[in-house]
């Protein structure tokens, strides 16, 4: 699906905007602080229920307003879908799909698979394991129907188990939680392992095009010892877990390691190379989704020129065009994106929260 229309009300510094969008490239050009990134963030929020620069809803609601409103129209091959999200300062959300309320944010995420590339996105590579788990979980969410429910139940059970660790004295008292936790943990780990294995060649091929000077390898670590039953791990770790008051092993401790020439990428690659790698991974993930399901990603790219020279920008642009996906790109100057423009693209100018085309 592509986003054909976007309405924004009281989001960041944007009071009102009604944008007719291209199914191809959409460029948002403006000075720093103009609001161009806010447009990208509005699209992201419409598909995720939260902003990517702040987790506190009050910070993205326009000054002295009580709530923001986002509305979009999605055009698929056979039908059009209307979606909407309202969120107030207390964080209460209302999701509307095709005119009916009561929907879940996960439904928006399913309708709008998107990849985000920002200057802060290096955390995928040099941040903690949670960012790389999120990378795998994005793929599992869009690939496995039962993943989101299983993942939500796992989070709930881990929270309950950690609370129980403060109160119990014998492992047998934890068995009611572990009886539910173990099959969920094993299923989620299986999904992650299968996904990381399935997409590995796509990632290797794309990374080779972007960073031919490096040999990159990828490895999934499930969060507990190989060839060890998770039930045994939980029982054996009980005393340590009780002392720590949290569960030290499990899928919530998984990681997806990326190495260049045998060394961690964060220790080997320059900032420009890290950005290229991040772009390559996001592209590979989106292309894999399209090949497996026929669904296309929506790409959000903030500050396109940052860290990339002309040749690398050209390579990224050509690969994005080849996906035939909808792409939103912000830039300080039109000169940075003019080579990407064609007869199907749209150029928006953003100034102090006002957007014109």
UniProtKB/Swiss-Prot annotation:
SUPFAM superfamilies: P-loop containing nucleoside triphosphate hydrolases. One of its GO terms (molecular function) is ATP binding. It is found in: Cytoplasm. It comes from the Bacteria. Keywords: ATP-binding, Cytoplasm, DNA damage, DNA repair, DNA replication, DNA-binding, Nucleotide-binding, SOS response. It holds the Pfam family SMC_N. One of its GO terms (biological process) is SOS response. Transmembrane segments: none annotated. PANTHER family: DNA REPLICATION AND REPAIR PROTEIN RECF (PTHR32182:SF0). Belongs to the RecF family. NCBIfam families: recf. This is DNA replication and repair protein RecF. The lineage of its organism: Bacteria, Pseudomonadati, Pseudomonadota, Gammaproteobacteria, Enterobacterales. The gene is recF.
């Amino acid at each position: 699906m592509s986003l054909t229309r976007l309405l924004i009300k009281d989001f960041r510094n944007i009071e009102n905007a009604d944008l007719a969008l291209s199914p191809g490239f959409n460029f948002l050009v403006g000075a720093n602080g103009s609001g161009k990134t806010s447009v990208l963030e509005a699209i992201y929020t419409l598909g995720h229920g939260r902003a990517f620069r702040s987790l506190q809803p009050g910070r993205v609601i326009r000054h002295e307003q009580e709530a923001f409103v986002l509305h979009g129209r999605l055009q698929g091959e056979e039908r059009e879908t209307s979606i909407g999200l309202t969120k107030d300062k207390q964080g209460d959300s209302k999701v509307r799909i095709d005119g009916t309320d009561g929907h879940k944010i996960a439904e928006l995420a399913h309708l709008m698979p998107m990849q985000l590339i920002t200057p802060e996105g290096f955390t995928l590579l040099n941040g903690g394991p949670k960012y790389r788990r999120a990378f795998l979980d994005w793929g599992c969410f869009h690939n496995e129907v039962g993943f989101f429910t299983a993942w939500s139940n796992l989070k709930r059970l881990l929270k309950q188990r950690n609370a129980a660790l403060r109160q119990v004295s014998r492992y047998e008292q934890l068995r009611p939680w572990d009886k539910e936790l173990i099959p969920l943990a094993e299923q989620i780990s299986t999904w992650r392992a299968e996904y990381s294995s399935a997409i590995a060649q796509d990632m290797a091929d794309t990374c080779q095009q972007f960073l031919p000077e490096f040999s990159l390898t990828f490895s999934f670590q499930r969060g507990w010892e190989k060839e060890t039953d998770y039930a045994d791990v939980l029982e054996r770790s009980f005393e340590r877990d009780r002392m720590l008051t949290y569960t030290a092993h499990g899928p919530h401790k998984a990681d997806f390691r990326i190495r260049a020439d045998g060394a961690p990428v964060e220790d080997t690659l320059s900032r420009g190379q890290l950005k290229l790698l991040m772009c390559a991974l996001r592209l590979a993930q989106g292309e894999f989704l399209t090949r497996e399901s026929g669904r296309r990603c929506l790409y959000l790219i903030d500050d396109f020129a940052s860290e990339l020279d002309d040749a690398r920008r050209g390579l990224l642009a050509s690969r994005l065009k080849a996906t035939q996906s909808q792409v939103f790109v912000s830039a300080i100057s039109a000169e940075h994106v003019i080579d990407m423009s064609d007869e199907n693209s749209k150029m928006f100018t953003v100034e102090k929260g006002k957007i014109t085309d």
